[in-house]
């Protein structure tokens, strides 16, 4: 029968490798297109990650995401997402590795949280943008899409510039909304840099040079949130590239 949700395989289990792993959730997502997502409990120490990735490489697996969830004196927990043609064989080899103590198969972050809208700036404006973004994301998520909304209230040119540049390092971040009354200087330069890397940037209509550097300028914060979600939703017929004007 199917394994209970959240089940793990303890290292050395006599059962067939993979038989007690959490199934890859597939509602709205084809298993053939979804990465194999695993939480590995390993021993701690130098060379552990090298050993794990070596096993994956031996199966021609392509690691699309990796993070260290927990690192203790004795035990480390790794989260990996891997594209592989033979998940069963890979799991079998991980099962017999002397560095792996337990394996849990989970749903990928892309499947659970999907694309991310990042909102930053002044708290009052961020809150209003979030209302629009969350309301619009709800419409698309009901139809099977996955869009999540992240917010951080920040003030100051340097903190905001650092945060803008960091967005491109966030997994699955697709659009950034800058919400405030005045932004320019180093923030403008950061906006131009992340846009060059493919990130969509929407700015509220504010003082400073950031609006001029952004893809889109929206006066109403709620509408800005709505348009941010529409810009990345696959279930919406909306494209910033097709707009005849940049300011709304």
Give, region by region, the residue ranges found by the protein language model.
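Compositionally biased, low-complexity flexible segments
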Residues: 1-20
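A conserved regulatory-domain signal marking ACT and ACT-like small-molecule sensing domains
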Residues: 25-120, 136, 151-155
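CheY-like receiver
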Residues: 246-248
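Conserved mixed alpha/beta catalytic, RNA-binding, or beta-rich assembly cores of soluble enzyme
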Residues: 106-239, 243
